[in-house]
């Protein structure tokens, strides 16, 4: 049986919010079967919980924000991408502020934290959402699509008319049956344009952003001294973001996501459209792991 997974131990980290610039204390904790990923604002009294589900998404400007009434948690996508990539079904994410810390701008530090905590298999089958037919949403020239696929695959294309992007790969397709999320996707960092940063800061966004936690591009070049981690790091980061956004289905996916210039808003619209079209998907479990089109790394012993 492919089982649900949680963390073996509690683990903590500290960072700053990309948009708020605030110091944030993050604690990841194990959670019981069928809990899902639940964010908890421990700085509030009483503590407010928000489940990581598509229907709880509020703002999608520059990041994905979960809301419960007037309480929010910003920038959840990189942590959720790490949870998805490592197959974590159930966890509590405790935060001392309204935003998940940006760390280095990728999912890599969250992968390290989760692997350091160790993974624990649980006594219940893991539930997958299997795509049965194509579902597409369009906004202008942007497009996001689910299609049936016996596994999990994410294809993405970006289209930036800019010197830095013209010479680099702007499309990628990652089939996770043959490609490691940890090695090939998790370290891709978020990116931004120098020309946009002043405007964003005037809107109280990107207050914590720097070359320490993002790829920064001016009119001609990448400003980070160390350059890029992957030749196709820009589009790989969009794949990383999409994996985090897709995990707001509440379950791992069997199917392919295709994005063309898609972002957090369109990704969320695709999830909501899929959920409404109940003939387009089914929930499945696998009693025999050998029959599953998706496999996960064996649980890692806590470091």
Curated annotation (Swiss-Prot):
Binding locations of Zn(2+): 78, 237, 241
Cofactor: Zn(2+)
Record flagged with keyword Metal-binding: yes
Catalyzed reactions per annotation: a UDP-3-O-[(3R)-3-hydroxyacyl]-N-acetyl-alpha-D-glucosamine + H2O = a UDP-3-O-[(3R)-3-hydroxyacyl]-alpha-D-glucosamine + acetate
EC number(s) from the headed UniProt entry: 3.5.1.108
GO biological process terms, semicolon-separated: lipid A biosynthetic process
GO cellular component, one term: membrane
InterPro entries per UniProt: Ribosomal_Su5_D2-typ_SF (IPR020568), UDP-acyl_GlcNac_deAcase (IPR004463), UDP-acyl_GlcNac_deAcase_C (IPR011334), UDP-acyl_N-AcGlcN_deAcase_N (IPR015870)
Pathway: Glycolipid biosynthesis; lipid IV(A) biosynthesis; lipid IV(A) from (3R)-3-hydroxytetradecanoyl-[acyl-carrier-protein] and UDP-N-acetyl-alpha-D-glucosamine: step 2/6
A single MF term (Gene Ontology): metal ion binding
Keyword match Lipid biosynthesis: yes
Highest taxon in the source lineage: Bacteria
Active site: residue positions: 264
Primary enzyme class: hydrolase
PANTHER family: UDP-3-O-ACYL-N-ACETYLGLUCOSAMINE DEACETYLASE 1, MITOCHONDRIAL-RELATED (PTHR33694:SF1)
Free-text function comment from the UniProt entry: Catalyzes the hydrolysis of UDP-3-O-myristoyl-N-acetylglucosamine to form UDP-3-O-myristoylglucosamine and acetate, the committed step in lipid A biosynthesis.
UniProt protein name: UDP-3-O-acyl-N-acetylglucosamine deacetylase
Organism: Ectopseudomonas mendocina (strain ymp) (Pseudomonas mendocina)
Lineage start: Bacteria, Pseudomonadati, Pseudomonadota, Gammaproteobacteria, Pseudomonadales
Gene: lpxC
């Amino acid at each position: 049986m492919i089982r649900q997974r949680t963390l073996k131990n509690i683990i903590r980290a500290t960072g700053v919010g990309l948009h708020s610039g605030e110091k944030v204390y993050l604690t990841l904790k194990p959670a019981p079967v069928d809990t899902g990923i639940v964010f908890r604002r421990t700085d509030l009294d009483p503590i407010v919980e928000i489940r990581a589900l598509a229907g709880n998404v509020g703002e999608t400007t520059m990041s994905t924000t979960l809301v419960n009434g007037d309480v929010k948690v910003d920038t959840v996508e990189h942590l959720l991408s790490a949870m998805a990539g490592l197959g974590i079904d159930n966890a509590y994410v405790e935060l001392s502020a309204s935003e998940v810390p940006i760390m280095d701008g990728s999912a890599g530090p969250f992968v390290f934290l989760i692997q350091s905590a160790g993974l624990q298999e649980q006594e219940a089958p893991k539930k997958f959402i299997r795509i049965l037919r194509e579902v597409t949403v369009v906004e202008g020239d942007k497009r996001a699509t689910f299609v049936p696929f016996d596994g999990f695959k994410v294809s993405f294309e970006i289209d930036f008319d800019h010197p830095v992007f013209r010479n680099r790969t702007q499309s990628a397709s990652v089939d996770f049956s043959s490609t490691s999320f940890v090695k090939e996707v998790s370290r891709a960092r978020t990116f931004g344009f120098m020309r946009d940063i002043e405007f964003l800061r005037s809107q109280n966004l990107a207050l914590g952003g720097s070359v320490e936690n993002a790829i920064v591009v001016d009119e001609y070049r990448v400003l980070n001294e160390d350059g890029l981690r992957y030749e196709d790091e820009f589009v790989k980061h969009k794949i990383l973001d999409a994996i985090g956004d897709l995990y707001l289905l509440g379950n791992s996916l069997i199917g392919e996501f295709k994005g063309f210039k898609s972002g957090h808003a369109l990704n969320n619209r695709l999830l909501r459209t899929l959920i409404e079209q109940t003939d387009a998907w089914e929930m499945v479990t696998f009693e025999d792991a050998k029959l599953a089109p998706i496999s996960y790394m064996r649980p890692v012993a806590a470091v």
